[in-house]
């Protein structure tokens, strides 16, 4: 199936939402005015003048280029007109282009490293250290917690305001040895395990991690809503933010929300109005309808080299959803006052890192120009 031929689910949802709105107004006249006000508010957001919208920088997340030296990567990004970078500092992204220890040990090296990007008009916008600092394996938990702490210290030194990572996932109890991702509270023991995870592991860890970040001038910890971690959707993100504080926000990677049937624009509006979006990965998802119909969307256990059994897979921007959908998404980020960057992440199993990133940049730049009325 050609990914571009996948049906546009948003138009169908828009139709159903409009139909439901009208039906509700007829069935409950006393609520019609409130529903009309909601519709008017959404319409007003869609009619914001381009002149008032921020030109959000378009950047790249560096793990897509593991075989390039830092200088080679900078040369390539400069040739492509990349405006910002998200740099891995350890954990799952590795630290291929960032010698963390050297930069922490020598302030002059840190200044020179950052200047290397800035001399090519590339902003070092974000440091990323995705890991599992609440792992039931104490060695993994301490390793990833230390990676987070060192990333905070490096961000402080470099003047970077945003750190990206995962919430992590504990085991199901104090004697467990492997993580246990729980999304359903029944049978009863699963609900008990979930409560234990949040009360005993997740909230205590992130309270102290946020305190450490705050003490070093870092006030934006962008957690990626990702399967297999306790923060995997907007609701769990907001739960942790409420428990820990406003240092916790979202790395809004919509590729993980599309398969959960989230409406991307609604997610951006909801989180954006709370000032809870700190970072945005730009990555797409395509669905294989026959497999969705047969197996549903919780169909991840397939060989990434054989997509014949997959219900969905990551794609470069524009290869899962249309450019018009991405226009709505990018405009929504602008309308809610998002202050970060658009960071292209390539995990496309079909396109190489270089091809996937370059094609995503092409789509995003053209869509941004169309929104802002620029060239």
Language model features by range: what are they?
Residues 19-30, 35, 43-45, 50-52, ...:
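Active-site acidic/histidine proton-transfer and metal-coordination neighborhood
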Residues 88-112:
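Glycine-rich, proline-tolerant flexible connector loops at the mouths of alpha/beta enzymes
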Residues 1-11, 38:
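N-terminal secretory signal peptides
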Residues 67-77, 143-152, 262-270, 326-328:
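Short, acidic/polar
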Residues 55, 84, 127, 186-320:
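Acidic/histidine-rich catalytic cores of soluble enzymes
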Residues 8-16, 29:
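Twin-arginine (Tat) signal peptide motif
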Residues 60, 77, 85, 117, ...:
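Conserved, mostly hydrophobic/aromatic
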Residues 73-91:
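Catalytic domains of carbohydrate-active enzymes, especially glycoside hydrolases
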